[in-house]
Every structure is written in C-alpha cells, then in structure tokens.
Amino acid sequence: MREIVHVQAGQCGNQIGSKFWEVISDEHGIDPTGRYHGDSDLQLERINCYFNEATAGRYVPRAILMDLEPGTMDSVRAGPFGQLFRPDNFVFGQTGAGNNWAKGHYTEGAELIDSVLDVVRKEAESCDALQGFQLTHSMGGGTGAGMGTLLISKVREEYPDRIMSTYSVIPSPKVSDTVVEPYNATLSVHQLVENADQCFTLDNEALYDICFRTLKLTTPTYGDLNHLVSAAICGTTCSLRFPGQLNCDLRKLAVNMVPFPRLHFFMIGFAPLTSRGSQQYRALTVPELTQQCFDSKNMMCAADPRHGRYLTCAVMFRGRMSTKEVDEQMLNVVNKNSSYFVEWIPNNVKASICDIPPKGLKMSTTFVGNTTAIQEVWKRVAEQFTAMFRRKAFLHWYTGEGMDEMEFTEAESNMNDLVSEYQQYQDATAEEEGEFDEDEELDDGMM
C-alpha cells in the first residue's frame, strides 16, 4: 500500500486539514468515531493510504497536527471529527508565532520541531511503503509558513527519496490577513523552491470569487472556502484511494508535471463547483466538465492562466465515463487552445480516471496546471516585499529573533529568479537554440 502521511501546520493549515479529513472520512464511510459504516468494498480497498487500522476496527487518520498555540487545536478537537485523530499526534506550543516567520522557523518553532519529528517518524514507521508527505499550511503567517517550511527541510533530510507535496495558501492581492504577509511569503517560497516536490497553490481571494460568482453566496465564511479546498485536495488524491482505469499517484503526478525542478507550483481547479448546501440537480457531461475545469473562473489561485502558457497539466476525472471520450475532450481542448500550451512539450496534458465519484455527484474533475501565469502571484508578492524592505519596515521583529538582513535579500532575489525563469519558458519556442544568453535573461527579469 502506498501511504501518505498528512501534516497540518498553523491555524490555516489545521482548518483546511480538518475539513479535508471530514470529506475524506465521508468518502470512505468512516464516522466521527472512526468506525466504518460504508456501503462498498471499494471504500476499504485502499483505505490504508490515509488511515491506520487500530484495534477493534477503528480507523485512525495518518495525520499530524501542529501549531504554536493551543487555540486552533482545541477547536479541531471540539469539532465534529475531533475524536477521530490520535491524541498523541496533536503537537502544540503555548506561545504562538504571532505571524512572525522567524519565530516559526528559528526560535519557537525550532524548539517544538523535534517532538513533531518524533510523531512523523512514528507515523512513517507504521507504513508498508510510504509514498510521501503532504502538508497543508499558509504562506503568510508565522507557524504554517515558518515552522511548516522548517518541517519540510527536516523531513527532506530524513526521507530524501519520498515525495513532498504541499497545499499552500498564498497571500491574496486584496484580502490581506497581516501586514507582514509579503515577508513571510517570500521567505517561505525561498524554502519551498528548494525543498518541496510539488506545491498546490490556493488563494483566499480566488476562493472568495468562486463563492460570490459561481456559488452565489452573499457572505462566504472560511468554512465555505475550506469546503472548496477540501474538494480539490480530495480530487488530487482520489486515484490513490480508489481503483481506476488510469491511475496516478503523487510521484507520477510530479514526474508528469515538473519539467524543471524549481518550477513546481501548480494551480488547481475543480468542476462542477457546488455550494455546501445544494448539490446540482443535473449531471454534467464530460465535455462540460472539461470545459469548466479549464475555465479561469474555476481556478483556486488569483492568477489568470490566459496570461501565460501551460507547461504541463493533469486532469483527474472521477465517476463512470468512457476513456475514449475523455481522451477526445483532452485532445479537443489542446487543439482549440494550442497557443496556451508550450509547443516544446508535446502531449503535455495528462488525464487520469478514477471510477468512484465524490459524495453527491455523478462525475467530477480536478484540474492541476503548471502554468507560467503563476508568476503574477510571485510578482505581486515581490513588489509588496520590496516596498517594505526598501524602508526596512517591520524588520526588527525578524532580526530580533536572530535573522539577518542578508536572508531577506537572498529570498528576494530567489523570488525574482523564479519569476524570470517562468518568463523565460513562457517566451521560449521549439525552434530556438539551447540556452539563453545570461545577460539577456537577467534583463528580461528586470522589466
């Protein structure tokens, strides 16, 4: 069995994570006490991917919950599925990181990290064939961003050959949570570029837009946003959990999606989008699903794929459907919009089909795209970063925890390099000879 160990860090990560476990338990017929009440053998066939079977037929999530303050943990514990998790797997401090990346990465977080790693080892040891780790966290805060990236680099040292995928909530253009978000996000990207295999980027603003525009919710709550996120996360992992005609696992996904090691930030989309209360009354067809999931309105990240080109993308269908029809639709999309796909990676769209649809739907699809348009996000963060860093605003909070200004400068230039790499591949054509001239590449990046 190919198991995944799930880690959730910080307030955002724990809220998304606990929603994800609600949805996944529901799909596998697990009730809040960990008992199985399903109606199909398929629910149990690969349940080991995310659950351990404990005594007397109880299923326990392979989840590690960490935070630097007890608040969020308490609300997870008090929530509907709070009794599902293993009590030892709640690891928390008392101080809080106070949205300070340095506290999460260097001081408070560093004190707690060893007890988290003990739990990670314990979970990893109980796996037959550990496939990899997934982390849910935000990039703008202190714990999820600072301590989350610290955990990634520690786990990387210990399990260098296992896939590390993250679901990272990136700062939104309009909805800002804290003033120092650009600092925290830039420092996080600096780490994720080096230490993660694949990052699925999510963004509150895009999620709000989906709630307003598509779901017609007037006052969306974080619960609604997290519902969308959990649908997408479940979609990306469904072929690990259920049998299907064309399966893909984390490693296959990484191999197909990452053409260059640093460019591993993906956008995810989901179709059909339904609000929590009302599932749609009419079943969608494969062409409609395909068209919807490539639609920029369905992307959970505030960057417009039409402003860039797809290096690669993967579409995961769920439900009973014909493989032939899926292939035709994929081909159709690529042929009609060929200018949006780089021509120097032929057949860069991968489809996979999983036979079991999500609860309440006949079919659904999850879209994962590696597009150069994601540079819009990094550009936006970099601009805000530079504006504050030029005046050294708020820096004392970080230097006070022992950080050096040099680290900020490095993170900033790493971010700018990332943007110019995306730009370089967006402009590249199949005919051109080899490498760009070094000077040219730098000039392009500055514009």
Swiss-Prot record:
Residues 426-447 are annotated as: Disordered. Residues 429-447 have a biased composition (Acidic residues). GTP binds at Q11, E69, S138, G142, T143, G144, N204, N226. GO terms for molecular function: GTP binding; GTPase activity; metal ion binding; structural constituent of cytoskeleton. SUPFAM superfamilies: Tubulin C-terminal domain-like, Tubulin nucleotide-binding domain-like. InterPro entries: Beta-tubulin_BS (IPR013838), Beta_tubulin (IPR002453), Tub_FtsZ_C (IPR008280), Tubulin (IPR000217), Tubulin/FtsZ-like_C (IPR037103), Tubulin/FtsZ_2-layer-sand-dom (IPR018316), Tubulin/FtsZ_GTPase_sf (IPR036525), Tubulin_C (IPR023123). It is found in: Cytoplasm, Cytoskeleton. Belongs to the tubulin family. Tubulin is the major constituent of microtubules, a cylinder consisting of laterally associated linear protofilaments composed of alpha- and beta-tubulin heterodimers. Microtubules grow by the addition of GTP-tubulin dimers to the microtubule end, where a stabilizing cap forms. Below the cap, tubulin dimers are in GDP-bound state, owing to GTPase activity of alpha-tubulin. Dimer of alpha and beta chains. A typical microtubule is a hollow water-filled tube with an outer diameter of 25 nm and an inner diameter of 15 nM. Alpha-beta heterodimers associate head-to-tail to form protofilaments running lengthwise along the microtubule wall with the beta-tubulin subunit facing the microtubule plus end conferring a structural polarity. Microtubules usually have 13 protofilaments but different protofilament numbers can be found in some organisms and specialized cells. This is Tubulin beta-6 chain. It comes from Ectocarpus variabilis.
